[in-house]
UniProtKB/Swiss-Prot annotation:
Alphabetized NCBIfam families for the sequence: IMP_synth_hisH
Subunit comment: Heterodimer of HisH and HisF.
The Glutamine amidotransferase type-1 domain, residue ranges: 4-213
Phylogenetic placement of the source organism: Bacteria, Pseudomonadati, Pseudomonadota, Betaproteobacteria, Burkholderiales
Domain of life of the native organism: Bacteria
Keywords of the record: Amino-acid biosynthesis, Cytoplasm, Glutamine amidotransferase, Histidine biosynthesis, Hydrolase, Lyase
Protein name: Imidazole glycerol phosphate synthase subunit HisH
Amino acid sequence: MKTSIAIVDYGMGNLRSVAQALMKAEPAADVKIVDRPEAIRAADRVVLPGQGAMPDCMRCLGESGLQEAVVEASRTKPLLGVCVGEQMLFDWSAEGDTKGLGLLPGKVVRFALEGRLQDDGSRFKVPQMGWNRVRQTQAHPLWDGVPDDAYFYFVHSYYVVPDNPAHTAGETLYGDVFTSAVARDNLFATQFHPEKSAEVGLRLYRNFVHWNP
């Protein structure tokens, strides 16, 4: 029987590219972009994408009527947060003093890199845009077949700071070391975009399809 994956459509996120990447990673999966609570409840696993500003994402999720179904899914189903979808899992964001879903304890803060120079003498830019390495800080099924220190694609100005260091699954250096992937029980989330990260991103998505926490 096919595993069914609901990509949550609350009006914020690159849904089609996520769906296409999941279907390419595992053609046998039943991937759907969904905008109804019952479709989230019916799915075997859930992807929460997010792009733009966290205040807008949280507002749109609340207005969509899907927030309760996402929180319900987070208790029992494999759930993958991507980019702002990762940030939304936490308690609070400094971006617009925004309350998150509170599924993982911690906060979201902005890069404090103004005026700092990189090794080549150029200034750090915020947002970080481009490829960067992810060092795996814990063994996890979603890292299966993904080389440690592999390059993933990032576009962001904010990043998560988990209260519990054990929830950090990956770290990245951009001026300072920050948490770029988190994991706890049936939750996994990334600051980077797997769908924009070539073969290693597809591998992570394939691992998510087959993950049974």
